[in-house]
Regions:
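FIC/Doc superfamily catalytic core
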Residues: 1-139
Length: 139
């Protein structure tokens, strides 16, 4: 069976997500380092010999969350943008109908993002926890 092709995020799309996040929740505008943004957007799409290194939808979403959060490319709103970008990626690829977060689990989502930002978890653990949160979300 052929591998599924995903609709990936691009730099301009992530900038738009960032602007929307700041518009909704406030914060300072500005891009701190375009190279770090480009790197964070490219990492989940990396390939070797024409084969994607990450083939699982949730793992790709976790990679967007992880690299956007850890690379800190924006002046403000990096954690919020990282989570929003991850959820938009999942929505665009049919995993979520609505990228909003249910109020009952907001603390768990916040803990995930804060743990990524503080380097308390690696990309693999980010994937495990994101997968768990998404399963809970569907219940």
């Amino acid at each position: 069976m052929p591998e599924r092709e995903f609709l990936h995020l691009d730099v301009e799309g992530v900038k738009a997500i960032h602007a929307e996040v700041l518009g909704a929740h406030g914060g300072s505008t500005g891009l701190r380092d375009v190279g770090l943004l480009e790197s964070a957007v490219a990492a989940p799409q990396a390939s070797f010999g024409g084969e994607p290194l990450i083939k699982d939808l949730i793992e790709i979403a976790a990679a967007y969350l992880f690299y956007l959060c850890r690379n800190h490319p924006f002046v403000d709103g990096n954690k919020r943008t990282a989570l929003a970008a991850s959820l938009v990626f999942l929505k665009e690829n049919g995993e979520l109908k609505d990228p909003g977060l249910p109020a009952r689990s907001i603390d768990a989502w916040e803990t995930l993002v804060l743990d990524v930002a503080a380097s308390r978890i690696d990309r693999e653990e980010t994937t495990v926890r994101l997968r768990r949160l998404l399963r809970r979300r569907k219940k």
